[in-house]
């Protein structure tokens, strides 16, 4: 067990399930539409900003300003690919006390803070575990983001708001362990 994970486990706490995301396409059915909409909005925003800049400058245009506009507007569509690559490297763990997502950092939430959760599949058949009111309201095209950026509330007594295991490869194992460790949670 790596040192980063070992630090997150309490004395006597045991890992009862581990999983990883199953293989998925970056622009699958669930995420393709969001990518194209984001790309169209970014192109329109970049064009509008360039036109505004060129219309309001006095003297010669500064190429650096144009480059900054294009780079900033180009980041949003590229982010879909960066997030997909990052999700592929995640490890999901369930212990007898908490849920963990391990990458270059560890995100965790105590099982006692999970008040609502669901196992849901997207249009591509990828099963994801969603915990918290915000996660349950999220569209399937946002589930990858939740696995990377979903934040449990910082208050120890507050229920988790947004936590997700995206596209779990071991579907049967995840279903069984969730029923076991969260038997009283609304699913």
Give residue spans per PLM region.
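Short, exposed beta-strand/loop patches in secreted or surface proteins that constitute
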Residues: 8, 92, 116-120
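Soluble N-terminal interaction domains of secretory/endomembrane membrane proteins
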Residues: 11, 86, 184-187
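Alpha-helical transmembrane spans
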Residues: 24-90
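Acidic, Ser/Thr-rich low-complexity segments on the non-lumenal side of membrane proteins
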Residues: 102-143
């Amino acid at each position: 067990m790596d040192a980063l994970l070992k630090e997150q486990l309490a004395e006597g706490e045991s890992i009862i399930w581990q999983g990883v995301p199953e293989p998925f396409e970056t622009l699958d059915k669930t995420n393709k539409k969001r990518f194209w909409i984001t790309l169209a909005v970014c192109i329109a925003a970049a064009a509008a900003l360039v036109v505004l800049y060129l219309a309001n400058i006095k003297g010669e245009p500064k190429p650096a300003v144009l480059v900054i506009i294009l780079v900033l507007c180009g980041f949003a569509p590229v982010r879909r690919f960066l997030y997909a690559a990052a999700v592929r490297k995640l490890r999901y763990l369930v212990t007898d006390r908490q849920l963990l997502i391990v990458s270059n950092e560890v995100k965790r939430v105590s099982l006692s803070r999970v008040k609502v959760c669901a196992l849901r599949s997207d249009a591509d058949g990828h099963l994801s575990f969603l915990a918290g009111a915000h996660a349950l309201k999220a569209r399937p095209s946002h589930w990858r983001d939740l696995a990377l950026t979903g934040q449990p509330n910082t208050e120890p007594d507050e229920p988790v708001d947004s936590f997700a295991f995206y596209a779990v490869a071991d579907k049967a194992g995840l279903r069984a362990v969730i029923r076991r460790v969260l038997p009283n949670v609304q699913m």
